Amino acid sequence: MAEFTHLVNERRSASNFLSGHPITKEDLNEMFELVALAPSAFNLQHTKYVTVLDQDVKEKLKQAANGQYKVVSSSAVLLVLGDKQAYQQAADIYEGLKVLGILNKQEYDHMVQDTVSFYENRGEQFKRDEAIRNASLSAMMFMLSAKEKGWDTCPMIGFDAEAVKRILNIDDQFEVVMMITIGKEKTESRRPRGYRKPVNEFVEYM
């Protein structure tokens, strides 16, 4: 418990990164193995990550992100995508429950149909909202996992989502939820932590 408290207290949004700290796919995959355990509605795992290590592509993303330098100084840039059609994978995702005998065929069929109907009956706005909700849960898990591995991150919303889609050839079924830069923070330029509301200002008991 003390370790988690320390992790949360140490995690900051890094505005400046040190150069010369490349990150490998192996480093990132260790984090993604933990991210895979993030909660998602109906276990649909709506989130996809497009991870950019190539410096030339990062330069293009910098332009789409209003010229923010941390995009190119970071070790990698992640685009967190939410799949608006994730419910269509319900049959594949639940297949294992049937194979293991946890669900019989009738229960499996009902579970798939109930999930699909839940989304289709609520329309396109709900599908988009769900993509954003679930991808945001996953993104927070990634940032904590990164910090636990000794890396610093910054979640970003200041970018042109349509430009990002064009640069990375992202299909319209995905919502670009946020951009995350990751690297080693240049701590000497870090500002003090911003004001945080006391608990009684954001929690209500009834």
From Swiss-Prot:
Its EC number is 1.-.-.-. It is an enzyme of class 1 (oxidoreductase). It is found in: Cytoplasm. Induction: Repressed by MhqR. Strongly induced by stress due to exposure to 2-methylhydroquinone (2-MHQ) and less strongly induced after diamide or catechol stress. Not induced by oxidative stress due to hydrogen peroxide or methylglyoxal. FMN binds at R11, R12, S13, Q68, Y69, K70, I157, G158, R193, R196. One of its GO terms (biological process) is catabolic process. Its main location: cytoplasm. Its cofactor is FMN. Keywords: Aromatic hydrocarbons catabolism, Cytoplasm, Detoxification, Flavoprotein, FMN, NAD, NADP, Oxidoreductase. GO terms for molecular function: oxidoreductase activity. It comes from the Bacteria. Transmembrane segments: none annotated. GO terms for cellular component: cytoplasm. It holds the Pfam family Nitroreductase. SUPFAM superfamilies: FMN-dependent nitroreductase-like. Putative nitroreductase that may contribute to the degradation of aromatic compounds. Homodimer. Belongs to the nitroreductase family. This is Putative NAD(P)H nitroreductase MhqN. It comes from Bacillus subtilis (strain 168).
